[in-house]
Swiss-Prot record:
This is Two-component response regulator ORR5. Belongs to the ARR family. Type-A subfamily. The modification 4-aspartylphosphate is found at residue 66. Pfam families: Response_reg. The keyword Phosphoprotein applies. It comes from the Eukaryota. Disruption phenotype: Dwarf, narrow leaf, low tillering and altered kernal color phenotypes. The keyword Ribonucleoprotein does not apply. SUPFAM superfamilies: CheY-like (SSF52172). Residues 16-133 form the Response regulatory domain. GO terms for cellular component: cytosol; nucleus. Its main location: cytoplasm.
Length: 134
């Protein structure tokens, strides 16, 4: 089984991060930060699309997802990933513009790797990726 550090990394390539956010602006920001740090990025606009992509391409190094999204929240996406024997090793990071300790704790208890507050800063992503993926 691939580890979180090797999962989604092609030989000699960069880690593959799945960015999930219903806001096109936030999706572009997080994708830009990740790409500037030399990560391969696939960006989708919903938890449902993330699960569809993971069904056809499970080789993702990490998932960074917004908490509040229509159809499926980031928390619901986290639960589905962690319940899947095929996907549960993928680190999931939740992002939110709301600093609500009960929500943060619930996500961490459910298996989230970390919780980032928006607006996400390049230093936050750099710290996170170096800890989780390198």
């Amino acid at each position: 089984m691939a580890t979180c550090r090797s999962r989604g990394v092609e030989r000699g390539g960069a880690p593959h991060v799945l960015a999930v956010d219903d806001s096109s602006v936030d999706r572009a920001v997080i994708s830009g930060i990740l790409r500037s740090s030399q990560f391969r990025v696939t960006a989708v606009d919903s938890g449902k699309r993330a699960l569809e992509l993971l069904g056809s391409e499970p080789n993702v190094s990490m998932i960074i997802t917004d908490y509040w999204m229509p159809e499926m929240t980031g928390y619901e996406l986290l639960k589905k990933v962690k319940e899947s024997s095929r996907l549960k090793e993928i680190p999931v990071v939740i992002m939110s513009s709301e600093n609500v300790s009960t929500r943060i704790n619930r996500c961490l208890e459910e298996g989230a790797e970390d919780f980032l507050l928006k607006p996400v800063q390049p230093s936050d992503v750099s710290r996170l990726c170096s800890r989780v993926l390198r």
